[in-house]
């Protein structure tokens, strides 16, 4: 693996899971590297019941840096998801609730589509939270583009959010951006992969003003660190690639990405 120095930039990692056990041995150092690389905020989507406490603990340890979300990931549905969903709704409605979005929520049929209808129902229920509580959605979608669009269609003019880790086709990008004007695409390490088709899709279809950056750490590490654990300090590598894709100065890309992020999360 060929490494390269991280050039500090001003950025917000809109999707990172550094509260997970993969970071238990060096979480403090990971945060320090993120700050050194220029991170202004690290936004933390929840996954399931077990992730709530470590996520909130990290936000308490770094209240100016880390901001939590609340939601149930589609691949983590319990046999009966409704007691947990009721608990999560209670957390969202508690006095002084710290949550900046409903997430990570969505539909994932890549490995298993046996609970397709239940995933759709749970996703719709959580989209209704976003509408009721005035929060953006952090959306996970894998092998479920049509189901995603159909489920969100009734909300298209009323909620905002991020289609996290977008890696779809020209047609899918166009449909998402045209159908959901309040949403942006979350772009991470995949855009740096040698054989990725994402740069061409972005260049052809997606205005820079409809993008935010993310890591999805510990996953989807950008080149040249691909194959190792991802972390928020690698976001500048993604920004540099986007500057190349859009043929714009890095400083301009930094500023536009920050503006896009603040447009979705207006209270950061």
Model-assigned labels for residue ranges:
Residues 2-268:
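Mid-domain alpha/beta scaffold segments of enzyme catalytic cores
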């Amino acid at each position: 693996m060929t490494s390269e120095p991280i050039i500090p930039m001003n950025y917000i990692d809109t999707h990172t899971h550094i509260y997970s056990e993969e970071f238990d041995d060096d979480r403090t150092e990971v945060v320090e590297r993120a700050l050194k690389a220029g991170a202004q905020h690290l936004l933390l989507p929840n996954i399931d019941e077990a992730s709530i406490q470590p996520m909130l603990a990290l936000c308490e340890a770094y209240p100016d840096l880390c901001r939590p979300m609340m939601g149930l990931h589609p691949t983590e549905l319990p046999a009966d998801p409704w007691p947990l969903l009721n608990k999560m709704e209670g957390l969202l409605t508690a006095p002084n609730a710290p949550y900046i979005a409903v997430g990570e929520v969505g539909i994932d049929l890549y490995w298993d589509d046996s609970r397709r209808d239940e995933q759709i129902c749970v996703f719709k229920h959580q989209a209704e939270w976003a509408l009721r509580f005035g929060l953006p959605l952090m959306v996970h979608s894998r092998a479920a583009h049509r189901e995603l669009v159909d489920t969100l269609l009734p909300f298209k003019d009323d909620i905002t959010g991020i289609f996290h880790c977008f890696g779809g086709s020209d047609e899918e990008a166009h449909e998402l951006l045209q159908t959901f004007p309040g949403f942006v695409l979350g772009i991470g390490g995949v855009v740096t992969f040698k054989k990725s088709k994402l740069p061409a899709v972005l260049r052809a279809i997606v205005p820079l003003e409809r993008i935010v950056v993310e890591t999805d750490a510990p996953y989807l590490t950008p080149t040249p660190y691909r194959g190792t654990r991802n972390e928020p300090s690698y976001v500048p590598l993604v920004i540099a690639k986007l500057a190349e894709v859009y043929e714009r100065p890095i400083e301009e890309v930094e500023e536009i990405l920050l503006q896009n992020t603040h447009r979705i999360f207006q209270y950061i």
